[in-house]
Amino acid sequence: SGSDGGVCPKILKKCRRDSDCPGACICRGNGYCG
């Protein structure tokens, strides 16, 4: 398990905090995961 734990999926997703984002993505200043 966790084989893709260091990967940020290339999905445009709105967020307010890092935990809103899939994988290793973080919530960027533009309000989207990246």
UniProtKB/Swiss-Prot annotation:
Q: Which GO terms describe its biological process?
A: defense response; negative regulation of serine-type endopeptidase activity
Which chain positions carry the site (Reactive bond)? 10-11
Q: Hydrolase: is it a keyword of this entry?
A: no
Could you tell me at which residue positions the Isoaspartyl glycine isopeptide (Asp-Gly) crosslink is annotated in this chain?
Answer: 4-5
Pfam families recorded: Squash
Alphabetic keyword roster: Disulfide bond, Isopeptide bond, Knottin, Plant defense, Protease inhibitor, Secreted, Serine protease inhibitor
Which GO MF terms are attached to this record?
Answer: serine-type endopeptidase inhibitor activity
Cross-link Cyclopeptide (Ser-Gly) maps to 1-34
State the post-translational modifications: A cyclic succinimide probably forms by loss of water between Asp-4 and Gly-5, that can then rehydrate to either the original peptide bond or to a beta-aspartyl isopeptide bond. Three isoforms of MCoTI-II are detected, two with the parent molecular weight, corresponding to the unmodified and proposed isopeptide forms, and one with a molecular weight 18 Da lower, corresponding to a succinimide cross-linked form. This is a cyclic peptide.
Q: Where is this cross-link: (2-aminosuccinimidyl)acetic acid (Asp-Gly)?
A: 4-5
SMART domains on file:
PTI (SM00286)
Q: What does this protein do?
A: Inhibits trypsin; probably participates in a plant defense mechanism.
Q: Which family does it belong to?
A: Belongs to the protease inhibitor I7 (squash-type serine protease inhibitor) family.
The protein's name is Trypsin inhibitor 2
Species per Swiss-Prot/TrEMBL record: Momordica cochinchinensis
